[in-house]
Curated annotation (Swiss-Prot):
Signal peptide: none annotated. SUPFAM superfamilies: SRF-like. This is MADS-box transcription factor 8. Probable transcription factor. May be involved in the control of flowering time. It comes from the Eukaryota. GO terms for cellular component: nucleus. The lineage of its organism: Eukaryota, Viridiplantae, Streptophyta, Embryophyta, Tracheophyta. SMART domains: MADS (SM00432). Disulfide bonds: none annotated. May interact with the K-box of MADS6 and MADS16. May interact with MADS13 and MADS18. Binds to FCA. The gene is MADS8. It comes from Oryza sativa subsp. japonica (Rice). GO terms for biological process: cell differentiation; flower development; positive regulation of transcription by RNA polymerase II; regulation of transcription by RNA polymerase II. Keywords: Developmental protein, Differentiation, DNA-binding, Flowering, Nucleus, Transcription, Transcription regulation.
Length: 248
């Protein structure tokens, strides 16, 4: 009766698990040795137990040399990897440069076409597209210019309104100042006696006698200030001055 098929799963019993590991490890190392001898192959085997213990087999001169050989074939080695990365960067930069160069040339060609140059190589569709682009640019330019003009007009109207308000304020202050000066002058004239006197107060004759120059305080109902002669006194003085002294 043959052996049954062993189910591949983790052995729960610790002792059985260690025994199985030792047996299979030795068998694996034996198979690696046989393969290297029978087939003249360079074989390297590395095993770590669950406790971290290392078991290895190498048919070559050393495990390090075999690992370097493996890394060289798998990843190209450290130097080769760096060189490949540099080559990739150079190729990527070159591709980016070519894209930018083609874009610059396209923009320069479009600029010349917009200026009316190098139009001979363009077809009808390209010329129509160029015409539409120019019309769109003109509409945008005119719209922007109109907006700037409207903004300037609005600013000028705002400044005009501000100047009108300032002018009204100055006019109002000037009128108030003139009115205040008029009141001051009238008040000063009243205090100094320069206000206009009535004709009866000027030509009133004193009831008592006098020499024509001095009058009694009771002569007038209100005290007034009189400077110089009255018209009658001026006439009497002139007549007296021209009369001879021998006349009575």
């Amino acid at each position: 009766m043959g052996r049954g098929r062993v189910e591949l799963k983790r052995i729960e019993n610790k002792i059985n698990r260690q025994v199985t590991f030792a047996k299979r490890r030795n068998g694996l190392l034996k198979k690696a040795y046989e393969l290297s001898v029978l087939c003249d192959a360079e074989v390297a085997l590395i095993i770590f137990s669950n406790r971290g213990k290392l078991y290895e087999f190498c048919s070559g001169q050393s495990m390090t040399r075999t690992l370097e050989r493996y890394q060289k074939f798998s990843y190209g080695g450290p130097d080769t990897a760096i060189q490949n990365k540099e080559n990739e960067l150079v190729q990527s930069s070159r591709n980016e440069y070519l894209k930018l160069k083609a874009r610059v040339e396209n923009l320069q060609r479009t600029q010349r076409n917009l200026l009316g140059e190098d139009l001979g190589t363009l077809g009808i569709k390209e010329l129509e597209q160029l015409e539409k682009q120019l019309d769109s640019s003109l509409r945008h330019i005119r719209s922007t210019r109109t907006q700037h003009m409207l903004d300037q007009l609005t600013d000028l109207q705002r400044r005009e309104q501000m100047l009108c308000e300032a002018n009204k304020c100055l006019r109002r202050k000037l009128e108030e100042s003139n009115q205040l000066h008029g009141q001051v002058w009238e008040h000063g004239a009243t205090l100094l006696g320069y206000e206009r006197q009535s004709p009866h107060a000027v030509q009133q004759v004193p009831p008592h006698g006098g020499n024509g120059f001095f009058h009694s305080l009771e002569a007038a109902a209100e005290p007034t200030l009189q400077i110089g002669f009255t018209p009658e006194q001026m006439n009497n003085s002139c007549v007296t001055a021209f009369m001879p002294t021998w006349l009575p």
